[in-house]
Regions:
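Catalytic cores and adjacent flexible loops of soluble metabolic enzymes
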Residues: 1-123
Length: 123
């Protein structure tokens, strides 16, 4: 996919090395992530203060709620990956507790766009 020049998102949740797994290319965007379901505040101590100062274009969110995704946007993340479910209570699959239901996802999109517009405007 990368060699076909297709847009590719790579979450680096388990990547422990300083260098990136592939050389930087225009069609690759890396996402900051902690591969734990769900993550806690303690797991996010190394969360980027400013995504523009990193190799990460965005955040792969495994936190409960939408607050960390919104924080990432406020810190310059251009891409948010968030799990989605129609009903968190319909299964025991661990991803569902941290997934966004339709209303939460809508809030994430609307508030995230508002934050992004304010940043773009220079506020």
């Amino acid at each position: 996919i990368v060699n076909l020049n297709k847009k590719t998102f790579i979450s680096l949740g388990m990547w422990e090395k300083k260098e990136l797994p592939l050389e930087k290319r225009e069609n690759i965007d890396y996402l900051w992530c902690k591969s734990k379901y769900p993550t806690t505040n303690d797991d996010l101590k190394n969360f980027p203060k400013n995504f523009k100062d990193t190799d990460y274009a965005g955040y792969s969110d495994h936190n409960i709620g939408i607050d960390m995704a919104l924080l990432a946007i406020s810190r310059g993340a251009r891409i948010i990956e968030k799990h989605f479910t129609l009903d968190k209570t319909s299964t025991v699959i661990r991803d569902h507790v941290l997934s966004a239901e339709p209303e939460e996802f809508s809030d994430l999109v609307n508030i995230g766009r508002s934050i992004y517009e304010k940043i773009k405007f220079g506020i």
